[in-house]
Amino acid sequence: MAGMFHLFTHAMFKALLFLGAGCIIHAVHSNEMSTMGGLRKYMPITHITFLIACLAIAGIPPFSGFFSKDEILTACFQFSPVMGWIMTIIAGMTAFYMFRLYYGIFWGTENKELHAAHTPHESPLTMTFPLMFLAAITIVCGWILPFGHFVSANGEAYDIHLNAQVAATSIIVAVIAILLATWMYAREKQPVADMLAARFSTLHRAAYKLSLIHISEPTRLALI
């Protein structure tokens, strides 16, 4: 039931992320995050709703992802403390890479060349209204939906409750991950991540060579 609960809440904030990505691509005529940056002042609605989705998927209360993710983590800790910690660390990694995405698009340094060719702009209401609608659902659906009254496969009522210790641990891990992403990617000049990549260039190149882009990009181009 925890998995089904998370599947439901995940549908809301993940749809919000995908629609937000569509608005961003529509605004800048590019899907390369490396060409973006500083878009928050051009796209305030997309910016705020995208931030809400990132907070939800990171598991920050009171957004819906917090409630459903915590049910999964509680079940994992009940099964095995080792499994619980593994899943908690993975959840922290999710918070980190989502805020890397958020800062890379809406903060950081503006791409002056891209903006000179095409000034970014907020999407029309036909595109931003679904964002606002999904953002509102993302905020409230975690604590107003009656998932605690659902029944399990054997007919017993499913007991949904927050484990205070698990919840506190997951929040601390998520906040640390978000702060780390903020430190590395939110700067408007040279992000800390770029400085670390330059300092450890050999390790950075080795890690980059392991990325799937070297497989996926030639395959995509061959299929076009």
Each predicted region: which residue ranges?
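Membrane-interface segments at the starts/ends of alpha-helical transmembrane spans
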Residues: A75-S80, E156-A167
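Interfacial and helix-entry/exit segments of alpha-helical transmembrane bundles
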Residues: H26-F63, L73, F79-A91, H115-V140, ...
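Alpha-helical transmembrane segments of multi-pass inner-membrane proteins
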Residues: F5, T9, W85-I86, Q165, ...
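Divalent metal-coordination and catalytic microenvironments
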Residues: H10, M36, G65, Y102, ...
